[in-house]
Every structure is written in C-alpha cells, then in structure tokens.
Amino acid sequence: MKGLILAGGSGTRLRPITHTGAKQLVPVANTPILFYGLQHLADAGIREVGIVTGDTGEEIRGAVGDGSRWGLEVTYLPQEAPLGLAHAVLIARDFLGDEDFVMYLGDNLLRDGITSFVDEFKAHRTAAGDDLCSAQILLAPVPDPQRFGVAEI
C-alpha cells in the first residue's frame, strides 16, 4: 500500500498566515500540519508516499526532504493547476501503479491517526475479496459543510 498526500492548495481561508508560506506547513503545536500526516502514514506501515504539490512545492520539498526522518520514501508530483482531487490521483497514476493507496489531505489532522482505518480496510479487502472492497472514505460532520465541500456518494 502506498500513500498519496495532496499538498497543492493555497490556503486562502488561512490568510494572512498563508500569504508567505504553504498552508500544509502551518504549525500545530510547533509541528507543521503536513508532518502529522506523514507520521500517520508511517505509523500505518506505509513506506512509499507521493506528495502532490502546487505553487509551494519547493517549500514543501525543502521541509519534508526525502522523507527518511519518518522512514518514508517520498516522491514529489507537481500539479500545475488546482484541478481537484481526481486530477491529483490522475497525476499520481504512474507512481501509484496498481497498488492500493491512502489519499491523505495535507492540511488535515486526524487526532488518532489512520492505522485503525488502514487495518480495517485491509481486513475487509481480504475477507470480501479484492473486487468487492475497493474503497473506504473517511468523512467528518461539520457545522457548515458548504465551506469545505459536500460529499455525495
């Protein structure tokens, strides 16, 4: 299983903080928020991670490096324009190949990490057979979902 972190957004809702830097590098408890995602992927046993970057790609590359501090191998995947989540996966198709992957939004913070979700997905995939369990989506209720996007399934 591989990891795919989307880190291309500009962070307009975090301005003025993001006028001078990547929103994924805004610190939470003195740690860039992106670093929590990288650690969560590593904790879940994922070693190969692709990071889709936008305008702040060089800043993110400078902060993350090769990923070795988390025991990861990081590949950077530039996205020329913010064309959505599906486009980011399209850009990453050569990196992902035919492997299962976790897509993690680089500005999200999950308090308890993702290990239990990855384990649950693997267990369901094994029990149901590869063709029957092909996706798992994590969503959280928010008071004003229109500000963030509404999932339709």
Task: Report each predicted region and the residues it spans.
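A generic "binding-loop/recognition-motif" signal
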Residues: 10, 21, 56
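Active-site glycine-centered loops adjacent to acidic/histidine catalytic or metal-binding residues
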Residues: 9, 107, 141
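A structure-centric signal for secondary-structure junctions around beta-strands
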Residues: 1, 22, 132-133, 147-148
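Conserved N-terminal catalytic core of the sugar/cofactor nucleotidyltransferase
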Residues: 2-5, 13-16, 26-27, 31-105, ...
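Short beta-strand-to-loop element that shapes/binds the nucleotide-sugar donor at the catalytic cleft/hinge
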Residues: 134-153
